[in-house]
Swiss-Prot record:
Name of protein: Replication-associated protein
GO molecular function, one term: ATP binding
Coiled coil: none
Domain CRESS-DNA virus Rep endonuclease: 8-116
Residue ranges of the region described as Binding to RBR1: 143-153
Function statement: Essential for the replication of viral ssDNA. The closed circular ssDNA genome is first converted to a superhelical dsDNA. Rep binds a specific region at the genome origin of replication. It introduces an endonucleolytic nick within the conserved sequence 5'-TAATATTAC-3' in the intergenic region of the genome present in all geminiviruses, thereby initiating the rolling circle replication (RCR). Following cleavage, binds covalently to the 5'-phosphate of DNA as a tyrosyl ester. The cleavage gives rise to a free 3'-OH that serves as a primer for the cellular DNA polymerase.
Residue ranges annotated as motif RCR-2: 57-59
Localization (cell): Host nucleus
Annotated S-S bridges: none
Sequence motif RCR-3, residues: 103-106
The entry's keywords: ATP-binding, Covalent protein-DNA linkage, DNA replication, DNA-binding, Endonuclease, Helicase, Host nucleus, Host-virus interaction, Hydrolase, Metal-binding, Multifunctional enzyme, Nuclease, Nucleotide-binding, Nucleotidyltransferase, Transferase
Active-site residues (renumbered): 103
Length: 361
């Protein structure tokens, strides 16, 4: 057995406390980095803390690539750069680097060097609670912070379920999409056929809207102004390429929907959208079903062709009944020329057709 009072520590993680130490965090880090050790230093965190008496204390977490054995209790002593004063720390082997790091996070005045080495243990007893780790991640305020917390405190889930975590956290911490502002007024579209203008004036309204409005399908070549015109009518939901109806994407306060370049063969909720149906639900990926208030018309925009045209889709032999239903719930028009006379709108239209905004003004 070792003699009483003999100093010896053999550990990968060291927790040092320097009481009444006025050195800056930068001075401490510089001196610790200069220490010659047989194993590489992987991570150093220096934390400055003011106690109630106003005296500064310094805490240090040192992580090594492998175990560092030392029998020299003066090994981690620091020296003042301006005088011959030495500062001796209390030295402990950190049972849980994650707990020590979290403790130092509370004070906030920290300086880090290197990459923190994840420790799945907790000094509070065994493995940390998964619920605690996930609760902290949800309260972190950002996707990146949440992922970093789970990397440290739920490393198994981080490795095995990263694809799900990444996707779910992207949705949870999705930024609010700013309202769309049309670069053109409706008057800029000076070649809109009268029957399309009439449809818009009768069906796209905030007040006095029809109880069961009629939708419209507009088919035409690219760069004819379909999308720009449709998005200039008022506040709307813009769905392009695929449908995502979660509450951060789809608004029940919109006047109408614009469904742009969605293959009708794979259009989810075809009848609900085209028929302006009210009070229906949609299953949201990685979330609970969302309630759609509905009762608003939809503008369907498409190009000619078998995987785009709604007319060609409804002409398929298996869709006879659906075609009859659609003829009573939507108007179908084919554009022969652009909806504008200015060349500039055509260039902008090409960019717009590639975008995917949401509720827009």
């Amino acid at each position: 057995m070792p003699r009483l009072g003999r100093f010896a520590i053999n550990a990968k993680n060291y927790f040092l406390t320097y009481p009444r130490c006025p050195l800056t965090k930068e001075d401490v880090l510089e001196q610790l980095l200069a220490l010659s050790t047989p194993v590489n230093k992987k991570f150093i965190r220096v934390c400055r803390e003011l106690h109630e008496d106003g005296e500064p204390h310094l805490h240090v977490l040192l992580q090594f690539e492998g175990k560092l054995q030392t029998k020299n209790e003066r090994f981690f002593d620091l020296v003042s750069p301006t005088r011959s004063t030495h500062y001796h720390p209390n030295i402990q082997a950190a049972k849980s680097a994650s707990d020590v790091k979290s403790y130092m996070d509370k004070d906030g005045d920290v300086l880090d060097h290197g990459s923190f080495q994840v420790d799945g243990r907790s000094a509070r007893g065994g493995k940390q609670s998964a619920n605690d780790a996930y609760a902290e991640a949800l309260n972190s305020g950002s996707k990146l912070q949440a992922l970093n917390i789970l990397r440290e405190k739920a490393p198994k889930d981080y490795i095995l379920q990263f694809h799900n975590l990444n996707c779910n956290l992207s949705r949870i911490f999705a930024d609010d999409v700013p309202p769309y502002v049309s670069p053109y007024s409706l008057s800029a579209f000076d070649k809109v056929p009268s029957y399309i203008s009439s449809w818009a004036s009768e069906n796209v309204r905030d007040s006095c809207a029809p109880e069961r409005p009629i939708s419209i399908v507009i088919e035409g070549d690219s760069r004819t102004g379909k999308t720009m015109w449709a998005r200039a009518l008022g506040p709307h939901n813009y769905l392009c390429g695929h449908l995502d109806l979660n509450s951060k994407i789809y608004s029940n306060d919109a006047w109408y929907n614009v469904i742009d370049d969605v293959d009708p063969h794979y259009l989810k909720h075809f009848k609900e959208f085209m028929g302006a149906q009210r009070d229906w639900q949609s299953n949201v990926k990685y979330g609970k079903p969302t309630h759609i208030k509905g009762g608003i018309p939809t503008i369907f925009l498409c190009n000619p062709g078998p995987k785009s045209s709604y007319k060609e889709y409804l002409d398929e032999p298996d869709n006879t009944a659906l075609k009859l239903w659609a003829s009573k719930n939507a108007e179908f028009y084919t554009l022969k020329e652009p909806l504008f006379s200015s060349v500039d709108q055509g260039a902008t239209q090409g960019c717009q057709e590639a975008s995917n905004s949401t509720l827009s003004n």
